[in-house]
Amino acid sequence: MKKRQSQTPQEYTAEAIKAVSGLEHVRLRPAMYIGDIGERGLHHLIWEILDNAVDEAVAGYARNISVTIHRDNSVTVEDDGRGIPVDIHPETGKPAVEMVFTMLGAGGKFEKKVYTYSGGLHGVGASVVNALSEWLIVEVYRDGKIYRMAFKRGEVVEPLHVVGETKKRGTKVSFKPDPEIFETTEIKFDIVEKRVRELAYLNPEVKFELTDERLGKHLIYKFDRGIEELVKYLNEGKEPLFKDIIRIQGEKEGVIVDIAFQYVKDYKERIESFVNNIKTVEGGTHVTGFRSGLSKAVIRMAQGLKLAKELKKSFTGEDVREGLTAVVACKVPNPQFEGQTKTKLGNQNVKQIVESITYDFLTSYFEKKRDVLKAIVEKAIEAALAREAAKKAKELVRRKSPLEEGVLPGKLADCSETDPSKCEIFLVEGDSAGGSAKQARDRRYQAILPLRGKIINVEKARIDKVLSNDEIKAIVSALGCGIGEDLDLKKLRYHKIILMTDADVDGSHIRTLLLTFFYRFMPKLVEEGYVYIAEPPLYRVKKGKKEIYIKDDKEFEHFLLNEIREKGRLVDAREKEFKGEELVRLLIDLKDYEDAYRALVKSKGENLVNFLLTHRVREEDLRNPARVKEITHLMEEELGDYRVDTKYNELEGAYDIIFYDDKLGTKTIIDVNFLSSLSYREVLEGIHLHLPVQVFFENKKVEINSLGEIYDKFMDFARSGMEVQRYKGLGEMNPEQLWETTMNPKTRRLKKVKIEDAAEADRIFTILMGEQVEPRREFIEAYAKEVKHLDV
């Protein structure tokens, strides 16, 4: 790390912060700054703050980074770097930390003196996060003090001030995405976990912690071997061609190159690539350079050693890369990104640098490891022969006509429209659902292809074997665009390919097989957004003459809350009335309160939590020795089962209170982190209702004397008189219901399949469908308790 520190010699102070312009525009045009206001943009807020923490690690200062998703979907990111500067900026007269969070583009990334390898301008978005957050709190641990500052929708509400002393250093940023801006504010654990794990592979010197208070999950990532362990992870369940994971590292013209790769007994090339910790989904010059360097090294060494004598035609670079899994990670001083998603590296000099580092290393490596070279060459020869065989197989299949243009499978119920952009095809599981779908469809533009036979497990099959399967043959001939290298999107007969399967395990399995097939053999269809999954409803709800279809449990809860909004009210003991939106907000708060209280009890025990709440113990109490003494005395009096001790925590500048339960042999610690947690603060503030309360719904009335019963009672009232049907499969619906819920473009829901995470999907498919039993068993055991319906 000393080497990296020497590349960032300038002091990180207020003068290192450069300001470009003000913040006015961000809330009006958020998509200009974060891409969109949907799920992607929402998570982009986390990446902006996380990237700042990682830049501190890359510069050689941070060793620990933690991300916490709180129960209200707010997020905290903390690092132990230098801490954002708090001194007054010479030009603006404001603290530097205030500039970072209130002035667009104020940051230390414009001048490479402070950060040599930041992700372009990714790290300067703290002000954008602030502008798009309902609230944001920043704490800086620097020079032995804890500095705190708070904002609301980008405006300062709590100026920078000192709240305590500490031996810690670093920055802690907590923020809650603004529901006035975003379509959804639900943070997805899987999305955050994937990014944090990715960063942990790329930064082996840093320990990452991820906590989700909603799910009770806590994960720690520290990968000492870095991207070698990512290669191992991607190859889980696959059989390696040779044991070694080959590692190439080098530096030239300020570009740092780090590559790890291994071959497996498979037919696909997988390359994951990164520049300055940013995933380059579309690859770029660094990937081109690696491919070229690898292919040249293998082909030239094979020719020199006459390893491919039996091959009439020479093998190609593509043959060399069959079965390759590689991770290419580069650090580039001034990266230029291009492509649709701005995730393709365009710097031309990087191609030559990566190619020469790769070629030089491998020629030397293969000299010493002839057995590894021989294994790669034999696999490339096999790939070249298979390529020729596949070509012949496709020609043979075409001659036999099922894939010939214009010849359609007999079971296809086609549509009359000939413009592909207006046509859609439903791939429907089973005969019964297929029959209903044929009756339900709009024949003008909707085609139905029932799939009744066994779909081949394409995990281990090459294209010639895949094409011998009747169901696959029917799909390929119906779509009309060819398969594999021959796929021509201009010949595609339908621009919406919709997978329609049951929500049960069998349906999920068939959907998985179909998705695997598209990923492996027709990836362009997924890349261009032609593949969709139908989302039939889970419930049909009928009340009187009113009948509606509901997608899932969450939507059902929203539906019931809407009923309560219209028909319910609550009056507390002081005759304060709640109705409409105010009542719904109160019920959501009550549910959150109960969930938070249960989480606290699970963490620290009921007696202890009740004591802390009764005596209103707060974070600042632990910084006051007299108050700590008072609290411990009260504990000894009221909680006879515990032995109480205290210990001064120099890092936090506060006391820890430690409880020993000698009967159970357990130890519980109450510290400032627990008392400052969102869950504890939420429960401590409580719900301001005076009991008992009167609950009214339509003509019903009941008196309730417990906060915990109010939400459930309203839900029971809202459900009464409803006829609720839960669907298990498509076959349970008649044609009219199937049309209304799943096929009518005006009322249905479709989910577009994205290829963004093709490598992860590929990995899961391999574990679930590959030949190695042990990884599959481990995967199913790990997830069986967490999922009700296995889905992809």
Curated annotation (Swiss-Prot):
Its EC number is 5.6.2.2. Residues 423-537 form the Toprim domain. Binds two Mg(2+) per subunit. The magnesium ions form salt bridges with both the protein and the DNA. Can also accept other divalent metal cations, such as Mn(2+) or Ca(2+). It catalyses: ATP-dependent breakage, passage and rejoining of double-stranded DNA. One of its GO terms (cellular component) is DNA topoisomerase type II (double strand cut, ATP-hydrolyzing) complex. One of its GO terms (biological process) is DNA-templated DNA replication. It is found in: Cytoplasm. Mg(2+) 1 binds at E429, D502. The record marks K454, N457 as: Interaction with DNA. It holds the Pfam family Toprim. InterPro entries: DNA_gyrase_B_C, GyrB, GyrB_hook, HATPase_C_sf, Ribosomal_Su5_D2-typ_SF, Ribsml_uS5_D2-typ_fold_subgr, Topo_IIA, Topo_IIA-like_dom_sf. NCBIfam families: gyrB (TIGR01059), PRK05644.1 (NF004189), PRK14939.1 (NF011501). A type II topoisomerase. Despite its similarity to DNA gyrase, this enzyme is not able to supercoil DNA, and instead acts like topoisomerase IV. Relaxes both positively and negatively supercoiled DNA in an ATP-dependent fashion, decatenates interlocked circles. If this subunit is reconstituted with GyrA from E.coli the hybrid enzyme supercoils relaxed plasmid DNA; if paired with E.coli ParC supercoiling is not restored. This the first bacteria shown to not contain DNA gyrase, although it has 2 copies of a reverse gyrase that introduces positive supercoils. HAMAP family: GyrB. This is Type 2 topoisomerase subunit B. It comes from Aquifex aeolicus (strain VF5).
